[in-house]
Amino acid sequence: MEKKVTIYTDGACSGNPGPGGWGAMLMYGKTVREISGGAPATTNNRMELSAAIEALQALKEPCTVDLYSDSSYLVNAINEGWLKRWTANRWKTAAKKTVENIDLWQKILELTDRHRVRFHKVKGHSDNPYNNRCDELARLAVRKKP
């Protein structure tokens, strides 16, 4: 039986593009693990995707995951079928433009093959303590010097 894991993620950027950070909380039973990281020159969307990627990569075995993010970009790409259409259209949008962040989307596809992941949208900067903590982790990571 696969482990059931709950993950919250968030990304932040100081300027867009600019220095960025991501944060994630992984919860399994009573165990909570916090992870974070950043990049010196990036975008907010890359940090949102990186948070999900790093959290899913931290799982040592295939799991059933509920992943919560305040990123419409991430959640809608999965839940609204954008990602499937992009891959079917050789990484072109409906407007025939090249999809941004292909490298990260490919990693997400790889990880969602390994894990059974349900993506959920949460309201950012609201009363969700897990999302708020991930936001704090991401903002702290922005300020860290590599």
Curated annotation (Swiss-Prot):
Residue span(s) of domain RNase H type-1: 1-143
Catalysed reactions listed for this entry: Endonucleolytic cleavage to 5'-phosphomonoester
GO MF terms, alphabetically ordered: magnesium ion binding; nucleic acid binding; RNA-DNA hybrid ribonuclease activity
Gene Ontology biological-process annotations: DNA replication, removal of RNA primer
Matching PROSITE patterns: RNASE_H_1
Domain of life: Bacteria
Family per record: Belongs to the RNase H family.
Subunit field text: Monomer.
Name of the protein this chain belongs to: Ribonuclease H
